[in-house]
Each structure stands twice: as structure tokens, then as C-alpha cells.
Amino acid sequence: MVKLTADLIWKSPHFFNAIKERELDLRGNKIPVIENLGATEDQFDTIDLSDNEIVKLENFPYLNRLGTLLINNNRITRINPNLGEFLPKLHSLVLTNNRLVNLVEIDPLASIPKLQYLSLLDNNITKKANYRLYVIHKLKSLRVLDFIKIKAKERAEAASLFSSKEAEEEVKKVSREEVKKVSETAENPETPKVVAPTAEQILAIKAAIINSQTIEEIARLEQALKFGQVPAGLIIPDPATNDSAPMEE
């Protein structure tokens, strides 16, 4: 494991990314704990902490500039309930392939006032009953969940389903019963990694953006490109035949 020191931060790659935001690349360092991010001097729009071994989403300094946090392929099981106090302008958060299990574990994200884009793909939490509706209910500012735009119909359904305190208490009750399962999951080292898109896939995504016919499709593809996801149905040209074939999920 590698400690996240000021020296590591200063020596790590930093650049303007595909959407012209200043990004700090801290991925793949086996970092176990978030610390010393004050050394960034709040100079970045995006911080990429993907492919590390972080267990708790906490210990951030006040970063007024940070808008995007990429922390997929880690071991996140807990989120600081006051996270929003330190990241007031965070609008995009990628928690793909972590170890969030129970619905109530995302409650702390409600403290982030401007959160609009969230990915929880490949967490066990997504398998829970009414997962999507619960997240929509708790995170009022959210516009896109798991790369799918939230519809007005879903907001209404979520509001209706969780209109009573009893409904939320039932969710918390189920969560308490599964605390032991959460611990066992957190100790399991066999969590598969999500494979990042290849150079060919990135080019195909960019081409798809250019050829898109709707604003919604452009937004979906841009988010996929930004967060390192491969959209379903992406067409990859075959250089040997000049034919194109859709990507399998």
C-alpha cells in the first residue's frame, strides 16, 4: 500500500482532460486512506482516485473548486455524513465497483448540495428492491443515476413510495439486519475490477457523440467518456473489414 502524501500528489500526472477541466490523476497507487489532499491547494476540477484500496470516503479538506470525483474500483463501504461541507461544488461522483451494500449507506450523499451525476454500478446496493427510487428520493438534486437520466415519472413514484416515515424505517431495519453481511463483503478480496475502455472504444464514443441526433444521447455519451464507461450498444469499427459491430455488455 502507498500512503497518499503531498509528495505523491505533486509528482502525479495533472493535465486538462477531454472536457478541458484540470484533472489530477492518482489512480492505481494502492492508496488505502484519503489524506493530505490539502496539498492540491484546490487547483483541480477533477480528481481521479480510481483503482486504489480506499475503504472510507472521508477526510477531505475544503475543496471549493472540485466538481468531479472519480473513485471507482476501490473498497468503499462508508461515506462521511458531512462530505458536502467539504465538497460544496461537487456535481459528479463515480463510485462504480465498490462495496456499498445497503440503501442507507448512500444517505450521506444528501449532504452534497449540487450533486447531479452519480454512478453506483457494480455495487451490491444496486440489487436491492427499489434501489433506484430510494436514491432518487434521498438525493433531490440528482439528474442522472448510473448514466440514465432521471425522469419526472420516477421522481413522482419515489416521492409516493417513500412518503411516510414508516417506509424509510423499514429500509433502515433491513439494513441493520444485513450489517454482518456488509462486513463479510468488505473483507472479500475477490471483487472483480471494471475494465476501462480501450483507445478504440474511446474513439468510437467520440465519433458517436459527433453523430448523435439528440441532446440526451450526446449527454449520455459525454458522461460515459468522462467517467470511463463503455455505453451499451457502442459500435466499434473492425479495421480488418471496415465493418462495425456493437459492443456486448
Curated annotation (Swiss-Prot):
Gene3D superfamilies given in the database record: Ribonuclease Inhibitor (3.80.10.10)
SS bonds (residue pairs): none
Pfam short name (any one): LRR_9
Domain named LRRCT: residues: 123-161
Keywords: Leucine-rich repeat, Nucleus, Repeat, Ribonucleoprotein, RNA-binding
LRR repeat extents: 20-41, 43-64, 65-87, 89-110
Signal peptide region: none
Molecular function per GO: U2 snRNA binding
SUPFAM superfamilies tied to this protein: L domain-like
Transmembrane segments: none
GO biological processes: mRNA splicing, via spliceosome
GO CC annotation terms, alphabetical: Cajal body; cytoplasm; nuclear speck; nucleolus; nucleoplasm; nucleus; ribonucleoprotein complex
Compartment list: Nucleus; Nucleus speckle
Family membership: Belongs to the U2 small nuclear ribonucleoprotein A family.
Role, per record: This protein is associated with sn-RNP U2. It helps the A' protein to bind stem loop IV of U2 snRNA.
UniProt name for this protein: U2 small nuclear ribonucleoprotein A'
Annotated organism of origin: Arabidopsis thaliana
The gene coding this protein: U2A'
